[in-house]
């Protein structure tokens, strides 16, 4: 099979730019909304091999995309570590209390067993004929972002609590455990068919400049090196990070994702690796010609 993302980010061949959406499977598709209505428990939906595979493939049945993104969630890792995780309407993720002692005693086999349906889903998607000459993107949350959810027990929105760093033993213990089990989760995704891994650091923008190395750069660098050792491309999305140039030079992903609040001209000047994303999603509410014009302008900017 051809490998459009690998060719782009590793071999630096750009004759065919790979195209996919960051939130590819989801509410904009009526076929997804139909499944979601019948399956209100989001965690159970992620653990349903057949339904999650169907959702993963839905966008590719409509659009000629270069890749499928496995239908899952970054919070499946805390779930695998026996933290209660649920998604509440008009609230978002809600996580239960966490005990470091309990966390330290979790065995690799327990974790893999809890997340086995995800790996089976990857295998099922990969074997589908639609995936011929398509990539399959697996993903994880960065250690910092998962730490924020696990301690904060909900979405931090735009800030973390003043006492977040009070218990350094808890923070360091969770980070160490997360690195260990994120590698397990990544390896199982790769072994079952993921061609690319993306690391989402959704709350990187909440880290003070003085703490970036300890909480954003180093933990993610360890994962990046692990993924590269498997000869698999890795894309990082440090949303809101204060210095994309410093991040890309320290963490060394194969490609980097940006959001629409970032100045693309600055990114083009400073970043020397492939860039994904950055187009304002509000453009999709415009007419067809405007969407086409904006997309082409954005592509031409990075030529």
Language model features with spans:
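N-terminal basic, low-complexity leaders that serve as flexible interaction/assembly modules and, when applicable
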Residues: 1-82, 86-87, 222, 300
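Active-site mouth loops of central-metabolism enzymes
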Residues: 38-51, 157-184, 280-290
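Active-site-proximal, glycine-rich beta->alpha crossover segments in alpha/beta enzymes
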Residues: 86-188
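Glycine-rich, proline-tolerant flexible connector loops at the mouths of alpha/beta enzymes
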Residues: 69-89, 97, 104-111, 140, ...
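Alpha-helix-loop-beta-strand connector modules within alpha/beta enzyme cores
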Residues: 114-133, 209-232, 269-273
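Alpha/beta enzyme core
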Residues: 152-199, 203-233, 245-254, 296, ...
């Amino acid at each position: 099979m051809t490998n459009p993302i690998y060719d782009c980010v590793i071999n630096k061949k750009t004759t065919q730019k790979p195209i996919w959406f960051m939130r590819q499977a989801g509410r904009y598709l009526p076929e997804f909304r139909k499944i979601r209505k019948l399956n209100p428990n989001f965690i159970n939906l992620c653990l349903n091999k057949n339904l999650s595979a169907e959702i993963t493939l839905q966008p590719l049945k409509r659009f000629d995309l270069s890749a499928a993104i496995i239908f899952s969630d970054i919070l499946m890792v805390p779930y695998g570590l026996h933290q209660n995780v649920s998604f509440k309407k008009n609230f978002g993720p809600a996580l239960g209390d966490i005990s470091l002692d309990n966390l330290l005693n979790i065995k690799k086999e327990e974790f893999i067993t809890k997340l086995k349906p995800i790996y089976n889903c990857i295998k099922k998607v990969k074997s589908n004929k639609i995936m011929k000459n398509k990539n399959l993107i697996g993903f994880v949350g960065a250690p910092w972002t998962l730490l924020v959810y696990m301690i904060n027990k909900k979405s931090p929105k735009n800030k973390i609590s003043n006492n977040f760093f009070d218990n350094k033993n808890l923070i360091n213990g969770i980070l160490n455990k997360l690195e260990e089990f994120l590698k397990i989760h990544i390896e199982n995704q790769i072994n079952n068919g993921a061609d690319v891994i993306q690391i989402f650091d959704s709350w990187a923008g909440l880290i003070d400049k003085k703490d970036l190395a300890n909480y954003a750069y180093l933990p993610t660098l360890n994962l990046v090196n692990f993924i590269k050792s498997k000869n698999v491309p890795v894309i990082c999305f440090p949303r809101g990070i204060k210095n994309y140039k410093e991040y890309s030079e320290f963490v060394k992903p194969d490609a980097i994702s940006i959001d629409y609040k970032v100045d693309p001209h600055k990114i083009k000047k400073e970043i020397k690796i492939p860039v994904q994303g950055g187009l304002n999603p509000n453009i999709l509410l415009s007419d067809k010609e405007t969407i086409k014009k904006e997309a082409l302008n954005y592509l031409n900017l990075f030529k």
